[in-house]
Amino acid sequence: MSTYAIIKTGGKQVKVEVGQAIYVEKINAEAGSEVTFNEVVLVGGDKTVVGTPVVEGATVVGTIEKQGKQKKVVTFKYKPKKGSHRKQGHRQPYTKVVINAINA
């Protein structure tokens, strides 16, 4: 059974495995740099370790592959018969990270 981990990043929990590419909330670092996730909630595999609230000494190491923005989300508010409308767009920034190692 392959080793996996559940990490907390950007206010979310993400299940990761070695070699997997994940999309997370923007991390302020350059593409190609290494990032370490210290908030590991669970490490699974042959023996599962559940943290209370995090697993002590466990880290997940990844490499930032690219920074980008998601597709545009358009919101439109409209009041009928009043000539009132408002259109607003938003593109959420993200970071693509490739997981290199799970250290338990």
UniProtKB/Swiss-Prot annotation:
The keyword rRNA-binding is annotated on this UniProt entry: yes
Single Gene Ontology BP annotation: translation
InterPro entries: bL21-like, bL21-like_sf, Ribosomal_bL21, Ribosomal_bL21_CS
The UniProt record lists the keyword rRNA-binding: yes
Protein origin, superkingdom: Bacteria
GO cellular component: cytoplasm; ribonucleoprotein complex; ribosome
A GO term, aspect molecular function: rRNA binding
One Pfam family here: Ribosomal_L21p
Keywords: Ribonucleoprotein, Ribosomal protein, RNA-binding, rRNA-binding
Function summary: This protein binds to 23S rRNA in the presence of protein L20.
PANTHER family: 50S RIBOSOMAL PROTEIN L21, LARGE RIBOSOMAL SUBUNIT PROTEIN BL21M
Subunit structure: Part of the 50S ribosomal subunit. Contacts protein L20.
Protein family membership: Belongs to the bacterial ribosomal protein bL21 family.
Protein's name according to its UniProt entry: Large ribosomal subunit protein bL21
Taxon lineage: Bacteria, Bacillati, Bacillota, Bacilli, Lactobacillales
Gene: rplU
